[in-house]
Design a protein with these regions (language model features):
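Conserved core of the sugar-phosphate nucleotidyltransferase
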Residues: 15, 28-121
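Short beta-strand-to-loop acidic/aromatic patch adjacent to the donor-nucleotide binding site
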Residues: 11-25
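Short phosphate-binding loop-to-helix
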Residues: 1-15
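Short, active-site-adjacent cap segments at secondary-structure transitions
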Residues: 26-28, 55-58, 127-129, 136-137
Length: 149
């Protein structure tokens, strides 16, 4: 919310102000993804970049046994960017309880907790998140295919 506050303090926050949030550990985001995020944030108020889940997703409430296996065709893997009308994002965030704020894992969860719609933007499998050493090797392989020197 600091970014929204900064924009407001600068006198630039309007009903049409769009904020695009992105993980710096996703260096392969494409122009198309960013462009579509801005478009759908303007049209729908909020959007999340996703790719269809290719693996079966299992839910476990206790960490030892499967409690649910959702239909794969309904499952997506979240990526970034995530984009929003800034004023609406701030408004919804302010309405969250401390308990709700404590379970936030990403900005779209703010909307989901308040049953607000979030449009899906098609991501890209190469928009990987570099978190573990293996991810860095994958990123290097992606770069290796596009190096010009």
């Amino acid at each position: 919310m600091n970014a929204v506050q900064y924009i407001e303090d600068a006198g630039c926050l309007t009903e049409d102000t769009i904020i695009v949030t992105h993980d710096s550990v996703r260096p392969f985001v494409t122009y198309r993804i960013i462009e579509e995020n801005i478009r759908y944030a303007k049209e729908c108020g909020a959007c999340d970049t996703v790719i269809p889940a290719s693996d079966t997703i299992v839910e476990s409430r206790d960490g030892s046994f499967i409690s649910n296996i959702p239909e794969r065709k309904m499952m997506y893997q979240g990526q970034t960017p995530q984009s929003f009308k800034a004023k609406k994002l701030r408004e919804i965030y302010k309405s969250l309880t401390e308990e709700e704020r404590g379970i936030l894992t990403d900005a779209c969860k703010i909307y989901v907790l308040k049953n607000e719609p979030v449009h899906l933007v098609e991501g890209d499998v190469s928009n990987i998140k570099i978190t573990y050493p293996h991810d860095l090797r994958v990123a290097e392989a992606i770069l290796g295919g596009s190096r010009t020197c």
